[in-house]
């Protein structure tokens, strides 16, 4: 990496923000690092600094995404649901949800020491579900729900409540949804 080709400090963060805003799909830390001619760790630090300034960037399993107000308003209905299943049913669970036109925004567990732990998922298609599952498997990462014997919450978003109702019905029929 030559010094004159590197993007520096605030200029680099401005450029990262521009790339994320212009991108139609998530950008990985590695992709951003290559574009900026810096290490992935520098990108992680830059993203943290941008988030600290309340820039709406989320980290998903596919990479970083800029969530502008228009994108957030596009998904108008939102609901938190409780689920219970083992790790072997995660792909089935996510597919049942996205098949109804619903996006799984995140997963949340209640940890006995740390309290609520939330991780962004942001999957809305079978392709994104497949990518998420492959990434979990290739990194040997554990699902958060494994820390709570399969109990977890998901925040679901969709253009309307009916789609979320349909996804919940599919999860209930599969024995995954925890009802009140």
UniProtKB/Swiss-Prot annotation:
Region forming the signal peptide: none
UniProt GO MF annotations: DNA binding; small molecule binding
InterPro entries reported in the protein's UniProt record: 3H_dom_sf, 3H_domain, HTH_11, NadR, WH-like_DNA-bd_sf, WH_DNA-bd_sf
Database matches in Pfam families: 3H (PF02829), HTH_11 (PF08279)
Consequence of gene loss (knockout): No visible phenotype when grown in the absence of nicotinic acid.
Keywords attached to this entry: DNA-binding, Repressor, Transcription, Transcription regulation
Role of this protein: In the presence of nicotinic acid represses transcription of the nadBCA and nifS-nadR operons. Also binds to DNA upstream of the niaP gene, probably regulating it as well. May bind nicotinic acid.
Quaternary assembly: Homodimer.
Protein name stated in the entry: Transcription repressor NadR
Annotated source species: Bacillus subtilis (strain 168)
């Amino acid at each position: 990496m030559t010094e004159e080709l590197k993007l520096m400090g605030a200029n680099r963060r401005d450029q990262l923000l521009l790339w994320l805003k212009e991108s139609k799909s998530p950008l990985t830390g590695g992709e951003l690092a290559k574009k900026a001619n810096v290490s992935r760790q520098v990108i992680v630090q830059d993203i943290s600094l941008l988030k600290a300034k309340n820039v709406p960037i989320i980290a998903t399993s596919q990479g970083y995404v800029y969530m502008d107000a228009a994108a957030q308003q596009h998904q108008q209905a939102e609901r938190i649901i409780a689920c219970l299943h083992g790790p072997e049913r995660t792909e089935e669970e996510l597919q049942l949800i996205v098949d109804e036109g619903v996006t799984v925004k995140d997963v949340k567990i209640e940890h006995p020491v740390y309290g609520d732990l939330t991780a962004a998922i942001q999957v809305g298609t079978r392709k994104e579900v497949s990518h998420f599952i492959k990434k979990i498997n290739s990194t040997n990462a554990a699902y958060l729900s494994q820390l709570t014997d399969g109990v977890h919450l998901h925040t679901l978003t969709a253009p309307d409540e009916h789609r979320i109702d349909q996804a919940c019905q599919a999860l209930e029929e599969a024995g995954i949804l925890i009802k009140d």
